Swiss-Prot record:
EC class of the enzyme, as a word: transferase
Protein name per UniProt: AMP phosphorylase
Reactions catalysed, as given in the entry: AMP + phosphate = alpha-D-ribose 1,5-bisphosphate + adenine; CMP + phosphate = cytosine + alpha-D-ribose 1,5-bisphosphate; UMP + phosphate = alpha-D-ribose 1,5-bisphosphate + uracil
GO BP: AMP catabolic process; pyrimidine deoxyribonucleoside metabolic process; pyrimidine nucleobase metabolic process
PANTHER family named among the record's database cross-references: THYMIDINE PHOSPHORYLASE
Amino acid sequence: MRAKVKILKIKTGSFNVFISPRDAEEWKLHPNDLVKIESGKRSIYASVAIGDFIEDGEVGLSQDILSSYQFSEGEVVSITPSGTPESVKYIKKKMKGEKLRKVEIETIIRDIVDRKLRNTEISAFITAIEINGLSMDEIAALTIAMAETGDMLDIDRKPIMDVHSIGGVPGNKTNILVVPIVAAAGLTIPKTSSRAITSAAGTADVVEVLTNVKLSLDEIKRIVEKIGACLVWGGALNLAPADDLTIHVERRLSLDPRGLMLASIMSKKYAIGSQYILIDIPTGKGAKVETMDEARTLAKDFIELGKKLGQYVEVAITYGGQPIGYAIGPALEAKEALETLMTGKGPGSLVEKATGLAGILLEMGGVAPKGMGKKVAKEILESGKAYEKMKEIIEEQGGDPNIKPEDIPIGDKTYTIHAQTGGYVTGIDNRAITAIAREAGAPEDKGAGVRLHVKVGEKVKEGDPLITIHAESESRLEKAIVLARRLEPIKIEGMVLQVIGNI
């Protein structure tokens, strides 16, 4: 069957092709049937949709397809019905609780990337993993398959260091300090980061305030081999593409199976050739990982997986019970990170965590003696060497290396919440702070977010400022204020908690 391409200005969220009712009847195709579209050496798989706005002999291609593949208006393509993918039987096997072989996992991942598997089948796969779990051998096979079905980065400068935080703590701009510190010590650290999914700012969102984060693999290779580091958005690259497709479905199901989470993180590291990896697991109330036992178990899994992949992994379990630094939101965090790099001084939680993590990497890379890494990292930060390296990163990625903190625009619609009573700050709700910052417009509105005025343990008087909300519009500010009043993100208590009388 052959048809002419019609470019449609339609986004469906998946790969769909549209045909006319008459062609559907003649070709015996039904809605959601899987078909193969071929033109020359190109071939894609997509689901059928039927619409009377399509002429007979035409095939309409959605923008989802055109964002990944090039087709031109009027181009003639062949359409072939495709049967049930072989990988479906392997998904059923996992649903029964059976262990998958390496080749079966590779087939599933290849079919996800090729779009042979639709969201329904991917949902079944994710649910099967959630219920039955994966062995470490299965996770290793999954990690390698996810990496090898995408692009791989080959950097000549060795050794290649990497750092990754599993997230869950507001204001975690730590890696914007860690990367230039490590690179200034002479090590190689190509850092790919994500945008925010449920947080107020991912590392890529923050760095984008300072410079371009959308680079090609060739550009990354050039920059890293020249200056030893980069800070880029991983989503602009074709690294472990199956990961993005599974995450999209996981979000809808509100599932995050541990095996898939491990493979998701480590597949990106494998794809960029990371040899020494530091995993940061923030732990505490309101973080993704709330207990030390859970953190230790997860740490062991990362280390064991690294061994199977030929990567050396260390894990830092860090305090995650309150935000890092005082700024939450892309521009606010970029400003705080840049100020810290420029002066060598900053919020204690930010400096301590950044130099602590950087110090571990310096020891792993052999440029600092055991037990001296943090001291060396602090010296690099305070000497200005980390700032000079950050300027190089900003310039090489297309930004202004001379950007100053005061040059960064912050949302000018503000509201400050004050203490209703005196006492001590006994808790800061991470999830509430994140929710307020997002309600104010972060991360889409770069200047939106929350500025903390206090931290846990500090004494406050009635009327003292607790948080300032920043927004770029009055409407977003009003919504954030309402939410902040309802959530009460800062908990204040007096030293006397209760008086019990003598009855």
